[in-house]
Design a protein with these regions (language model features):
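Small/aliphatic-rich secondary-structure junction motif
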Residues: 1-63, 144, 157-224, 242
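Gly/Ser-rich helix-loop-strand patches that form or flank binding pockets
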Residues: 15-17, 21, 27, 96, ...
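Aromatic/hydrophobic pocket-lining residues that form π-stacking "cages" and hydrophobic walls in ligand
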Residues: 18, 22, 83, 107, ...
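A short acidic, glycine-rich active-site loop
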Residues: 58-75
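Ordered, amphipathic secondary-structure segments that act as subunit-interaction surfaces
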Residues: 72-82, 86-92
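A short helix-to-beta-strand connector/capping loop
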Residues: 87-98, 214-221
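Short acidic loop-to-helix transition motifs that present clustered carboxylates
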Residues: 101-104, 227-231
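A short, acidic, amphipathic alpha-helical segment used as a generic capping/interface helix at domain edges
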Residues: 210, 228-238
Length: 279
């Protein structure tokens, strides 16, 4: 099912937690871990530094470039060494790779040859992200990657049970398949939550779920909840009854997201447990 998991790592505290989750899940699923550190090409090009150096009479930026490149490469090797050591301490022997480029694009490209991407909710440059519309690296990877993406929070806890947020959309159907497969493989009990104020819709969703689950022998329950999607999902997470949430990503169109916001983005940013997303 899941043979390879890509873990982008930047040495941040959030990134270290992502590695711990990767180790735990790799053992559960017998998967190979691949660590990736992306040297941000923006730091190497340094347009801001170039402008400043010229205006205050410092030597041209090009004279500093070899020193900057050497420092970034040295740091990359140290981060990947720490990744390998963390995995090897848990008796896992990962691959470790370095790339130079735009961070989200490099992650997506590397992820094409893996089954999952697992990355931190926030990275080293969280406060320097591109703004609320485009969002964080995690959101960009979820939106653009064709692979399941697990986004991990600040702190680690073992996963013993999981929930699926289900609304009947095509991404949610894919998430249902993924959640059931995971429940079988990892023996995690599954709670499916459907959030709607329409009883007819609730009945339709329940029948659809039951029909899909019929061939499977897993520990599963379905709960119908009235309310607003993002609020009820976050409330369910805060109750602490599960340690992993699975959901379909960006099930609505971009115009609706711009007007009323995206449940996916809201959950990615605020969740205190890992969120596994699929398109």
């Amino acid at each position: 099912m899941v043979k390879t998991i890509l873990i982008p790592t930047d040495g941040s505290d959030y990134g270290k937690t992502a590695i711990d989750y990767g180790i735990y899940i790799a053992k559960k699923l017998a998967a190979q871990l691949i660590g990736l550190h992306v040297v941000d090409v923006g730091l190497m090009q340094g347009p801001v530094f170039s402008d400043i150096s010229g205006s205050i009479g410092l030597p041209p930026y090009q004279e500093f470039l070899p020193v900057i490149e050497a420092g970034l490469n040295e740091r990359a090797e140290a981060i990947l060494k720490a990744f390998r050591e963390r995995c090897e301490a848990a008796e896992l022997y990962p691959e470790a790779r370095k790339a130079i480029g735009i961070i989200d694009e490099s992650i997506i490209e590397a992820g094409k040859k893996t089954d999952w991407i697992l990355l931190a909710q926030r990275g080293e440059h969280f406060h320097l992200t591109k703004g609320s519309i485009l969002g964080s690296t995690a959101e960009l990877v979820v939106r653009k990657s064709g692979k399941p993406v697990m986004v991990t929070p600040a702190t680690y806890q073992d996963i013993e049970s999981m929930a699926l947020a289900y609304d009947g959309s095509p991404p949610a159907d894919n998430a249902l398949k993924l959640a059931v497969s995971l429940s079988e493989k990892a023996a995690w009990p599954l709670t499916i939550i459907c959030i709607t104020g329409d009883q007819a819709v609730a009945d339709k969703l329940h029948k659809k779920i039951e029909a899909y689950l019929e061939p499977f022998q897993i520990d599963c329950e379905t709960i119908m909840i009235r309310g607003q999607e993002d609020r009820e999902i976050m409330k369910f997470i805060r109750e602490g009854s599960v340690e992993l949430l699975v959901m379909g990503a960006y099930g609505h169109n971009r115009l609706r997201e711009l007007l009323v916001g995206s449940t996916t983005s809201d959950v990615i940013r605020k969740s205190k447990i890992p969120v596994l997303l699929t398109r």
